[in-house]
Amino acid sequence: MSHILDKIDTVYPFPPKPIPLSEEEKSSYIASIKELLKQKDAVLIAHYYTDPEIQALAEETGGFVGDSLEMAKFGNRHPASTLIIAGVRFMGESAKILTPEKRILMPTLEAECSLDLGCPADKFSEFCDAHPDHTVVVYANTSAAVKARADWVVTSSIALEIVEHLDAEDKPIIWGPDRHLGSYIANKTGADMLLWQGECVVHDEFSADALRKMKSVYPDAAILVHPESPASVVELADAVGSTSQLIKAAKELPYQQMIVATDKGIFFKMQQLVPEKELIEAPTAGAGATCRSCAHCPWMAMNGLKAIEKALSEGGEEHEIFVDEALRVKSLIPLNRMLDFAEQLNMQVKGNA
């Protein structure tokens, strides 16, 4: 059973789209980045939702492409003293929380996440304080300050198991920040959950009506859906899961066509694993010209070659992630609680977005 707060419609200002580079400029920046990675003892770690050329460069230079938690864990294990995180800001913070001794750089610190923006730490803390009998469970797509206020940090791959565990102990739950994922988990578990009203601007735009129409055009296609999508979209899915889980589903499902309802950046890695299959972008609510995100996170798009080269060459406060040590230690507690729980279940914890 879920208790949903009144939804507040928030229109987030999107950053300007990066200026396209010529092929000559791209080649120049790539060569410079490769040299700087060696000079700075750095490794490039990119999220699935960054542009394909960024993911390709990360792999080519011995870096990594993955979801949010995988990125932080790779950086923790890698011997490089500097991590350049191509993603959104909470991902850089997560890397710093797990690996405080390393220098964490980002192409820009202005790459936000609507889930993070929609869950300010002060407001969320007030809400939690008003319900002191509730266990606070937050999605990894949050700031270090919100994580520090939580009892548990979860990823979408283990959220169901943790909520089932808490529900078995008759613990009411505050869930934040994604209302769609919270509703999905509440419906699956029957747990008593109060849901914070955040959403991902990309997944919130997927349309069930438009998806049904697309399915009629591709009747033999499987539908893959991220659980940050509206319930009406999730109900149409053949597979529901995090980025890593959707990539796995694309490989395992016996379909030659896949309609994919998540950020289209995922197509780079997905197509690598299933080159023989046709991947089709799921339709957004805007049906073309009127969509806002159009199935690609506007903040992920800020992680361009020029910005990466600048971060490596200049560094400084415009690019380096710092997390207050007291806050870092406090936020590490609920994160380790999840990792310990996963170890007990012998589960491999994957990230979200």
Curated annotation (Swiss-Prot):
| Pathway noted in the entry | Cofactor biosynthesis; NAD(+) biosynthesis; quinolinate from iminoaspartate: step 1/1
Write down the chemical reaction(s) this protein catalyses.
iminosuccinate + dihydroxyacetone phosphate = quinolinate + phosphate + 2 H2O + H(+)
Q: What are the protein's UniProt keywords?
A: 4Fe-4S, Cytoplasm, Iron, Iron-sulfur, Metal-binding, Pyridine nucleotide biosynthesis, Transferase
Q: Which residues bind iminosuccinate?
A: H47, S68, Y139, A140, N141, S156, H226, P227, E228, T243
InterPro entries reported for this sequence: NadA (IPR003473), NadA_sf (IPR036094), Quinolinate_synth_A_type1 (IPR023513)
One GO cellular-component annotation of the UniProt record comes to:
cytosol
Q: Which GO terms describe its biological process?
A: 'de novo' NAD biosynthetic process from L-aspartate
Stated EC number for the protein is: 2.5.1.72
How does the cofactor attach, per the note? Binds 1 [4Fe-4S] cluster per subunit.
> Where does it primarily localize?
cytoplasm
Locations listed in the record: Cytoplasm
Query: Which residues make up the binding site for [4Fe-4S] cluster?
Result: C113, C200, C297
The coenzyme or cofactor needed here is: [4Fe-4S] cluster
Gene Ontology MF terms in the entry: 4 iron, 4 sulfur cluster binding; metal ion binding; quinolinate synthetase A activity
Family from the record:
Belongs to the quinolinate synthase family. Type 1 subfamily.
Under HAMAP family, the record lists: NadA_type1 (MF_00567)
Per its database record, what is this protein's job? Answer: Catalyzes the condensation of iminoaspartate with dihydroxyacetone phosphate to form quinolinate.
- Which NCBIfam families does UniProt cross-reference here? nadA (TIGR00550), PRK09375.1-1 (NF006877), PRK09375.1-2 (NF006878)
What is the recorded name of this protein? Quinolinate synthase
Gene name of the record: nadA
